[in-house]
């Protein structure tokens, strides 16, 4: 009977987000702004992010604005700065610059115009601290380590079971729980290779140095702008953060061995060890490494390249960000792809919320599955391309030919390819993505 689809006592649409990292909180902010009932379940005691830097493209910032303008406020109030402004700060355009890190000249090899505020960089911990203030009190629950997900049938709520013995009942679940996602393990099985990230055979020495020290090592122009130092089997990137008081450093090296500890992606290292990998590189770059603390960390680069997820959603469960498509950081835009995910999922769930208002739980549950199916259809190909491309550009940065004067011309031919790949990330048409997602959702619902 048609009347059986109407339920005036229907509860608000409830979404459980597993993971309180940057993508999870941004997604929650977008949903809250659209009147959707949201809970974020974070396994840690509080919000914790490493102090390393991260950057967002102008496109990603525009996606943030569509989700909730308060997210952009949080970004800029946390000390975000353009990463690589024009020479002597005379212009507001951002540039990505590649320089010769191996030879003494430190010659600029290529420059790519990212536009006005093309990239904005911040410290992860400071951004997350500001982001959390965007959410109303009570949205986030900490110390909630996901144990199991119970899916009874299509008409009932999804139940989240936590390690502390508590439960949560929600209409749908979004896994934003990062590279070691428990939600992903639920979808594919704990023993499946699709459920776990795999070593890319690269690791990084990461840290922050003061702007004063960076200037003494590199000169003011390089210290205050983003530069990628390329060379054989390694590369180093740096850019300013924290209102230009600090410089974020990431030195990536190739590793033919397997990562020794699959339970931890971070291991101890020393400054001297890092400098050993760059022993034959130019003095300025080695001076940068010399300003790192004596005891530093070695970060393994794991991703989903070897076993990409066959799907990002099933029924009323969906994956976003690193939980769906963890990538190595060589494009510097992994979080940007996650923000695209958050915008797409938010707009689709808002459509579910509006189009099923007053209708039965059967209709709503079917609509959620249709929305997540649409998300999978429009997001998976681009996200998996990004995972592949992140590996590819690292190979270009670390070509052995950089060290061979007779083969350098071959290495330098890589920049047109890098430009094309970068533009595919920077100039993504998110409005067309949203239009396609809504059209697919409505088609799936027969409307």
Swiss-Prot record:
Please give the chief subcellular localization of this protein: membrane
Which catalytic residues are annotated?
206, 239
Q: Which cofactor does it need?
A: FAD
The UniProt keyword set, sorted, is:
FAD, Flavoprotein, Glycoprotein, Membrane, Monooxygenase, Oxidoreductase, Transmembrane, Transmembrane helix
**Superkingdom of this protein's organism:** Eukaryota
Query: Which GO terms label this protein's molecular function in UniProt?
Result: FAD binding; monooxygenase activity
UniProt-annotated binding residues for FAD: 42, 55, 124, 322, 335
Which GO BP terms, alphabetically?
Answer: secondary metabolite biosynthetic process
Pfam families associated with the record: FAD_binding_3
The record's GO CC annotations read:
membrane
- Enumerate the subcellular locations listed in this protein's record, separating them with semicolons: Membrane
Q: Which InterPro entries match?
A: FAD-bd (IPR002938), FAD/NAD-bd_sf (IPR036188), FAD_monoxygenase (IPR051104)
The pathway to which it is assigned is:
Secondary metabolite biosynthesis
In UniProt terms, what is the effect of altering residue 206 to E/Q? Abolishes the catalytic activity
Effect of deleting the gene: Impairs the production of tropolones but leads to the accumulation of the intermediate 3-methylorcinaldehyde.
TM ranges are: 12-32
Sites carrying sugar chains:
153, 243
How is this protein positioned relative to the membrane? Single-pass membrane protein
| Enzyme Commission code(s) on record | 1.-.-.-
Q: Which family does it belong to?
A: Belongs to the paxM FAD-dependent monooxygenase family.
According to its UniProt entry, the function of this protein is described as: FAD-dependent monooxygenase; part of the gene cluster that mediates the biosynthesis of the tropolone class of fungal maleic anhydrides. Within the pathway, tropB catalyzes a synthetically challenging asymmetric oxidative dearomatization reaction to convert 3-methylorcinaldehyde into a hydroxycyclohexadione. The pathway begins with the synthesis of 3-methylorcinaldehyde by the non-reducing polyketide synthase (PKS) tropA. 3-methylorcinaldehyde is the substrate for the FAD-dependent monooxygenase tropB to yield a dearomatized hydroxycyclohexadione.
UniProt-recorded name of the protein: FAD-dependent monooxygenase tropB
Which species is this UniProt entry from?
Talaromyces stipitatus (strain ATCC 10500 / CBS 375.48 / QM 6759 / NRRL 1006)
